[in-house]
């Protein structure tokens, strides 16, 4: 839902004080007339730059003159242009270049001066002179996209500006410059749908009353204009408040103001050029820029808003916006529900609602004063990435007619608007105003701050940072309220030439910072703005101009601002809020980080890092001392502030902070009248009690600041004695009571804070002790567990080592026993033969294993054979390998135990470091607690000093009171009033305080009751004495009456003397009673304070004892840890010993392994010798026992071997049969699939051929009909000609033509019938040929299989064992190859086979496979037929290659190797049979072959040579397809050549060949 914003000008009602003036600015009438008539000047709307603010029409609907009027840069300052330069600088441009062409990538770009206006127009010209006509203009409001073009152009820092009609490429000199330009230009396409507002407030459209002014004032008022629409806009609560605001301001320093004359101004006059922030360009000026002094203005009328003549940018390029005489106050509906803004709203609205009334009264009082303040601001730019704004405040002396004028000029908060809340944050710091008097003031504090410098930027700077607008002193103060308070130019009423200056002392800073996301830890760049107590961050400065806020942070909620060296970015710092939320920021340099830290800490009220904590308090005390006015009565000096700890801010209440920040900290009151003083104190107490104690700590500082602003220094009013002393006494009593209540409230607050701090300290101490105890117990448990685990592992390792030692000893003993056994056997068998000894020596092996080998003694060496020896050898070898594996496993376990020991050592070191860290932290916390206790004692001593000072003041007031009692009537009045008050006190209830709910108020109430009772006793005694004095007076009067006749003069004198004496006595008695009551009260208080001191000392002793206990616990834990460390050291030593033992054992194992290896080598040598000796023994045995050998044994042995071989052969044959069956089944399935595929292809080809023939017949019929029609038409023409020639020739010609036509018709009909018959015959022949080929191939395959079966049977029937062995070997090798191929199939092989077959039919076709040339190539290219004709003359090996692919595992499984050459030939024959002619078949018909087929079939039909139609048809065919004859001749001529055409060409030219043969036969017959 979008609403159109209509900016109207409504003149305000004239004020009652002045009549309405007829003179107004001329722009109001111009705007109303411009809407009805044609708009003569296009002025862009502030919300939608493409619309005019006068007529609300689009830019395109305006005339060229109106647009040119907007574009011009006026040199006359009285008529400024409506648009401004947002950014300018030198860039490089590539005009209309196509970067897809590599030539443009190497060209040089053109350097041009770019100017971006605020209405979205981007122009570039050759130089930076304003008179130069721009070369091109880009409307950024129509731009679709602004992106980086580095990949497209190949140039770094390039940008692509994509518009609907063209793409413009630009680039900067550096990456920063191009990024700045990209950020600014990319905001235009992104903000197309962002200009619509949802609401306007017509109530804010108020203009103050006008008065006749000079031309200079009018030009000044039109020149000063609000140049930006800020995100935060505050509105006045009513029209009257706005009128009061505007009426209290004056515009120019040269304008004069008379008493009672109304002030002439408009709202647009408040938005001066010098208030502009100048950040809309998105860049800052470099530090090394030269500053230039401002030249005097052209005239006095434009002194405030004029521009520098020497500044070429400011004088020629910059054009001020045409300001409307009246503008409406608007509020943008903020629809962003961000958490930060909501939190700030929640924390601030409580304060704002409570103090709304007070602030509004202060504002009314401030606005009703007739003071005039001047304002002059300049700016200073510090660095490229940030901008610091230091607020310079100069104090001026003005007359003060009302005490409320000293209060800060603030405005009431709007409770329902977020911008009002944000402005409340900004306005939280009050300004300090000095009071002037006719007399010379005392020493005042002059605030010396840095004077901002005015920089000027040359236009030719290629970085583009123009900074054409001056910077605003307070950027957030964009509304008229704040400008009227802080930045209004006026002239002093005294007529001095130099106006006084006042500025807001707000913290302000801007710059680029990197912000880290808490979830993803990614860094993003934002434009940060610190204004007052709010830290805003935007995407870029342009978003700040438009008010598009990314987030806001309340600086008052910060508890720490510290550097962050552990961050991934350099120059990082961390902000922590009261709810433990962290915000990590990073700057681009250390200097900027330090400046940000300083400004943020000062804005948050935190102490600086590099300065001592006392400095801020001392400076504040010094400032307050300087601001105090000279008093008529002596004031006690303020006590110096104690050491400033971080806990002070945390535990300080709002009331304490307010009193400390106010001027009377240390002194109870400034010397002001008692009535005003008591009222102010009561009001401050009420405001303190109204604050909620449950508010979060985020509002702590705001409350402190508000209290501080409430308690500003009061005016000095000289004390005037009242005519009656009774009122004075009453007022003094009230003041004393108020002071006593204040002292009691303060003491109660101090006690409450002390109790809270003590409770928190004790709770923290207990928590830390519990935490330390738990951590120590955990550490002990973990250490004990680790020690237990280590001990278990060590015991296990020791047991394993012992087992290994036992097994080694057992193995060594076994080896020694075996050696002895071998020696004994050798000694026993030494007498035997040499052969037997060698046999025994080599048959018995050496047992060298680590396992149990006791069974070696049971071995009979005579019964050992070769197999048993091999088995024994394998068994021994396996045992030895097991022993080696066990040794390796032990080594691995040893390594694992070493690694575990290292990990335990590391864990122990980490625990020790953690313990030391904990000890350090505990020591630091103990020091902090001691420091806090010391701070509390200092505060207690300062409170005692204040109590003493208050006692002195009470004594002085008592003296004054005793001296002021004069007269009897006054004393009676005073006593009656005191009596009445006591009666009221008795009857009424004591007032409840805000802290009555707490238990700490019960002793105070009891003390107050005691004090009231004592006062009642005193009053009763004084009343009795007064009654006695009255009775004495009555008696004296009666005596006087009786004695009047005797001596009237003496009696009167005596009566007067007695009265005087009585009065003096009564006064002395009353004063003594009052002194006694005061002394009693002070004594009671002293007793209470002593009791509290004793309690505090007891608490201190208790804390000291707790500290001693904690120290003892720490010492005990240290001793425990030392013992644990000693145990660890002893265990380390034991572990080292164990490691040494393990090393020794590993060395012994290595030696034993070497020994085993040597023994193995020796065993191998012995085995070789044993084998040789066995061979020799066999030869000797054969030679000796050749004659006695038994033939039956040989036969049995050979029969067993033959049986084994036969079983093997049977197994191989069964495997072959199964494989053969599997192969045949696979082949049959493949054959069936191929037959089905070929049948389907055949059917499709036949259907296509029939469709082609039908289409050809239809085409021939249509061609014949057309030809007949042409012939008939031609015949008619010739017939008409012949008729014209004569009737004689007509008869003969007609007969001849009729005969020709009849013959032609008959021939056409006959040939069409013949052609259709031949086509049908050809189709039938083709089908028969396919069936014959398939049958032939199947028959050949079956024949080959039968031959294979015969071969297998022959192999099976053969009785030759050698052939069987060879056959089985080949079978097993083939089986292995078959298995390998079945497991992994290799790449397919291309087999080429040449086979030439001829058939008995006339249409002889070769059954070879297809050539590599595709049919589309031969038909699309007319030269392809010639290439095929040339390829037909090539050798037959290249022509007849087959592309049929068979996997190698199928070939290997289907072929059985044979020993003779016949198997090889049969195998090749099987390859040829498998490679059938139809395997590579493809249908010959294609949809795009129709024309060629028609031409081939029509051009070679057997037509009579005498027919004209045949001749013309041949000519047309020869002209249309000259290559067709070559195709047919090349395909038909070599009939006996084995290189025959493929099936593609066969089906294509079958009908043509048949017709050709018929034509040849007819020619031969003729």
From Swiss-Prot:
Q: Any one cellular component term from GO for this entry?
A: actin cytoskeleton
Q: Name one GO molecular function term.
A: actin filament binding
Compositionally biased residues, Basic and acidic residues: 646-663, 976-989, 1423-1438
Q: Where is the composition biased (Low complexity)?
A: 1-16, 23-32, 392-405, 990-1003, 1393-1414, 1520-1536
Keywords noted in UniProt: Repeat
Matches recorded under CDD domains: PH_M-RIP, PH_RIP
Where are the stretches annotated Disordered? 1-32, 194-318, 373-415, 483-509, 627-728, 976-1004, 1375-1438, 1514-1544
Q: What's one Pfam family the UniProt record gives for this protein?
A: PH
Q: Which residues form the PH domain?
A: 84-190, 506-605
- Mark out the compositionally biased spans (Polar residues): 211-224, 236-269, 373-382, 487-496, 627-636
Q: Does the keyword ATP-binding apply?
A: no
Q: Where is the composition biased (Acidic residues)?
A: 271-293
Quote the protein name from its UniProt record: Protein outspread
**Species of provenance:** Drosophila melanogaster
